[in-house]
């Protein structure tokens, strides 16, 4: 299969092309039904003559080309309708009836605040052009009305509030929010790309529109990605402030699978300047070795790394409710545990050559001994709660 992507250097085009090439090159094996031979990338700097060749060869066309921020409103129609007409005429000249996808906009509904949108009018004209083309040629036509998009590689200070907020937060620039309660419907770029790959496999999600809302059914005139997120500007800004604070607090906010927070965090990180990609951790060091907190979570405890010098014993304490995993990743050590009030000692000899996780049981005093005379013992530790100096739940007692 040969695929033509117009607007290939834009935000959506770049993400789509890289994912198409990952499938083509066997790097993405989640789409075994897709056999991609070539990806034709067409953009403003592509010689126009190449469009003729691409249209002759293409087995599927993603038309992502368009104008978002013209110098004058007349350019909306030229960029969003004019090129679409050229593209379809070129396909016609080669009698190529391959499926064609159009990236339109929710503004094409011309409803509410979009009623007088020149951008929306140009997008609607492009839609009707595609639908007419489909009727005339019997080529499959897939028209997507995108809501607000966000994700990596989106240009800030252009046409995405999320991109601007992420960029400014990451680079310590101010953010202007006129109304924190303003709600946006947002589509994450990876969810959109997955939908476009579904479309390529002949499985688009079809719909019609009830106002601005897609109503999904198999015979719908339009297509839409099924997963979007409705979120307020205030919620976005609050999340970004928590992401920004993570290197200093070590606290990773809740980012459940599929959540907006998870997708926004990934987007935010893509805007970090080089100096923020790396950050220092506080190493608590003494004659015995060191202890460094790595990461804290809001509901799943915290991670730390402990280094014990040769011959050193650490620990010698127990907890009521706190419990831990100890995982030796380098060196040779002995972990001992004894239930408080009992004389029986549980012993586990561990080595970094064979990583094993050892429970530090509640109500058991425990220690960890470096058995080596020459090498440090390095242990990754997880505790089921963040350390609270006011309630440490830690009591000294030798094993």
Language-model features, listed with the residues they occupy:
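NAD(P)H-binding glycine-rich loop region in Rossmannoid oxidoreductase-like domains
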Residues: 44-86, 90-94, 107-114
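Conserved Rossmann-fold NAD(P)-dependent oxidoreductase catalytic core, especially the SDR/UDP-sugar
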Residues: 85-127, 134-137, 141-144
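A short glycine-rich, His/Asp/Glu-containing loop-to-beta-strand
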Residues: 275-316
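Short acidic-glycine-tyrosine-enriched beta hairpin
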Residues: 339-363
């Amino acid at each position: 299969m040969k695929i033509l992507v117009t607007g290939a250097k834009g935000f959506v085009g770049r993400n789509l092309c890289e994912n198409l090439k990952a499938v083509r090159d066997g790097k993405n094996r989640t789409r075994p039904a897709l056999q991609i031979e070539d990806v034709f990338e067409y953009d403003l700097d592509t010689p126009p003559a190449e469009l003729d060749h691409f249209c002759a060869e293409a087995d599927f066309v993603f038309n992502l080309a368009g104008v978002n921020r013209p110098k004058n409103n007349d350019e909306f129609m030229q960029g969003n309708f004019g090129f679409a007409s050229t593209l379809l005429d070129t396909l016609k000249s080669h009698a190529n009836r391959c499926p064609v996808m159009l990236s339109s906009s929710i503004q094409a509904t011309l409803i509410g605040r979009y009623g007088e949108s020149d951008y929306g009018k140009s997008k609607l004209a492009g839609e009707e052009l595609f639908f007419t083309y489909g009727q005339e040629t019997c080529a499959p036509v897939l028209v997507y009305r995108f809501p607000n998009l966000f994700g990596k590689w989106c240009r800030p200070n252009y046409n995405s509030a999320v991109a601007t907020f992420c960029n400014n937060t990451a680079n310590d620039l101010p953010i202007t929010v006129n109304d924190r309660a303003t709600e946006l419907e947002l589509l994450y770029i990876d969810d959109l790309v997955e939908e476009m790959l579904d479309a390529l496999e002949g499985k688009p999600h079809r719909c019609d529109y009830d106002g601005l809302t897609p109503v999904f059914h198999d015979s719908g005139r339009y297509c839409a990605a099924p997963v979007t997120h409705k979120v307020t500007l205030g919620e976005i800004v609050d999340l970004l402030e928590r992401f920004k604070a993570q290197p200093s607090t070590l606290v990773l906010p809740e980012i459940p699978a599929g959540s907006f927070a998870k997708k926004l965090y990934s987007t935010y990180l893509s805007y970090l300047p080089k100096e923020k990609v790396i950050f220092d951790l506080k190493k608590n060091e003494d004659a015995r070795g060191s202890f460094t907190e790595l990461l804290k979570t809001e509901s799943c405890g915290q991670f730390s790394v402990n280094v014990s010098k040769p011959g050193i014993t650490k620990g010698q304490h127990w907890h009521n409710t706190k419990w831990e995993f100890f995982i030796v990743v380098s060196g040779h050590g002995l972990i001992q545990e004894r239930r408080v009030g009992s004389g029986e000692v549980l012993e586990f000899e561990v080595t970094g050559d064979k990583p094993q996780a050892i429970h530090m049981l509640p109500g058991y005093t425990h220690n960890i001994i470096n058995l080596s005379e020459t090498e440090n013992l390095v242990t990754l530790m997880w505790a089921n709660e963040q350390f609270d100096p006011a309630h440490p739940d830690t009591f000294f007692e030798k094993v």
